[in-house]
Swiss-Prot record:
The gene is cysS. This is Cysteine--tRNA ligase. Its main location: cytoplasm. It is found in: Cytoplasm. A motif ('HIGH' region) lies at residues 48-58.
Length: 537
């Protein structure tokens, strides 16, 4: 079913909102960013299947879309960002059998690990983290609607989507239905067409299940995202993000389900980030237009062939954060334009660390001259508030031009690699100003040279915070204070997950969290005003 596009007649952005352009995977072009209901923006990112600890590849999408939300908010939009958690899946069931513990317990543990790692990388803009198991009524209703409209069919307790009923199937990925023929697991022989995919899977002995009109079972992977995005963002929303490897079959199937169910496009802008590749040396950072064009043309197979994954031994993210710091990893991920492949090895990560140190040295130098901390500077939090008149001041004239160049880079499909290169231009300009005016500790705070320096540096604070960088002094790797802060954060995440489990009467999971923490030397204290924790002696 191909529906009329409700996005065809939308209001132009107000004069306060800039001319941002976004690369849309569906159209294969950069398009003006015109939200459906400006200034409100709905954004959905496919999150993890929480069956094992996170690795660095899982952080690529969240860091990118956290930055995109920051920039859209800075540009005057009101963004609602959703990241789903897949907590029922074949991999989770397999891990449950392997470890001999409930699937829900594994999901709680690994969700806490994922969220703790996001926090360390400064990903704090997520508004909703829906879990599939909390949305079974919505998922079942969604499947029922597809069946009643003739887009799905049930056979022996399994429900499949009929891809032949959607003439638009394959437009997102340029794939044919024949490419989908492996989907369906052990029930694949029941399908009417090789390309049909599972919406509901009948229960097998020893596996978790939910009651449904088709009997006991559990949802397929693709339907979870369609149901949860619809529940929170509505029938059609602005941005759907995810890794390039999810374009097919996952996003293609999501799009088919939602479009057919609602008779309207699911998403206006499909955005796909490049994947992370390990073990190669190569250039990272702001790329030329030619390099970016080549990255756009790279196929899914080319990027996925070297993709970092658990199966290839990736892991140890908590240890990596401990040794490198979350800010260094975030900086490393943002140095590359988001649609490009990120080359990950010791050399490229070390290069990012060296680059970051140049900023830290400047912040120390600034503090020595002015007596002020860079991290305490007052800076504009909205684009419309950050403009200024250089009034003939040489330094401010340069910084004003640099700010415009930074904004142009971000307006051009959120090119963080180019934006970071512009910040390096600013750094060189500021250091030249200090050297030319021989500024040092004890300089007169009211001198024109120092006043210009403070104003110019506040602009750098404004722009870097848009990228989620330099909001607070750098953490030292392995420091006791950082460890204590991380421990408190993780325990409170588990306390909240335990509370939610008990509220839905999943007492086994709640007790498992308490007991596992006790094994690790953490005692939970339940009181009328809430739950706190302490180390066991």
């Amino acid at each position: 079913m191909t529906a009329a596009d409700p996005t065809a007649s939308v209001a132009s952005p107000s004069s306060a909102q800039p001319a941002i352009r976004v690369y849309n995977t569906l159209s294969k072009t950069k398009e003006p960013f015109l939200p459906l209901r400006a200034p409100r923006v709905g954004m959905y990112l496919c999150g993890p299947t929480v069956y094992a600890e996170s690795h660095i590849g899982h952080m690529v999408g969240p860091v990118i879309f956290d930055t995109i939300k920051r920039y859209l908010t800075y540009s005057g939009y009101e963004v609602t960002w959703v990241v789903n958690i897949t907590d029922v899946d074949d991999k989770l069931i397999g891990k449950s059998k392997e470890r001999g513990i409930p699937m829900s317990q594994i999901a709680v543990e690994m969700t806490a690990d994922y969220l703790a790692n996001l926090r360390e990388l400064g990903v704090n803009q997520i508004d909703h983290l829906p879990r599939a198991t909390d949305h079974m009524p919505q998922i079942i209703a969604f499947i029922g609607s597809l069946e009643s409209k003739g887009f799905a069919y049930a056979i022996d307790g399994d429900v499949f989507f009929d891809v032949t009923k959607d003439p638009g199937y394959g437009q997102l990925s340029n794939r044919s239905v024949e490419d989908q023929q492996g989907e369906g697991g052990g029930a694949a022989a029941k399908k009417r067409n090789p390309g049909d995919f599972a919406l509901w899977k009948s229960a097998r002995p020893g596996e978790p299940f939910w009651d449904s009109p088709w009997g006991e079972g559990r949802p397929g992977w693709h339907i979870e995202c369609s149901a949860m995005s619809h529940e929170i963002l509505g029938e059609t929303f602005d941005i759907h993000g995810g890794g390039l490897d999810l374009m097919f079959p996952h996003h293609e199937n999501e799009r088919a389900q939602s479009t057919c169910c609602h008779g309207a496009p699911m998403v206006k802008y499909w955005m796909h980030n490049g994947l992370m590749r390990a073990g190669e040396k190569g250039k990272v950072g702001g790329k030329s237009d030619r390099e970016n064009a080549a990255a756009e043309a790279a196929s899914v197979e080319e990027q996925a062939s070297g993709k970092i994954s658990r199966s290839k031994g990736a892991g140890g993210l908590a240890d990596l954060i401990r040794s490198q710091t979350g800010e260094r990893i975030r900086f490393f991920l943002l140095r590359t334009q988001y649609r490009s492949t990120i080359v990950y090895n010791e050399e490229t990560l070390a290069e990012a660390g060296t680059s970051l140190e140049a900023f830290y040295r400047y912040f120390d130098r600034f503090a020595e001259i002015t007596g002020d901390s860079f991290y305490d500077l007052s800076a504009a939090t909205r684009r419309a508030d950050g403009g200024f008149d250089p009034a003939g001041d040489a330094l401010l004239t340069e910084i004003h031009a640099i700010r415009e160049k930074f904004l142009a880079a971000m307006d051009d499909d959120f090119n963080t690699g180019a934006a970071i290169s512009v910040l390096f231009d600013a750094l060189r300009t500021l250091n030249r100003h200090i050297d030319a005016n021989q500024l040092a500790a004890g300089a007169d705070a009211k001198s024109p040279a120092v006043e210009s320096l403070v104003k110019a540096t506040s602009v750098i604070a404004e722009l870097s915070r848009v990228l989620g960088l330099f909001a607070k002094p750098p953490a030292t790797s392995g420091g006791d204070e950082a460890d204590a802060e991380l421990l408190d954060s993780v325990v409170h995440l588990l306390i909240n997950l335990r509370k939610e489990a008990r509220e839905r009467k999943d007492y086994a999971t709640g007790d498992a969290i308490r007991d596992r923490l006790a094994d690790l030397g953490v005692a939970l204290l339940d009181k009328k005003e809430g739950t706190s924790w302490e180390r066991k002696s």
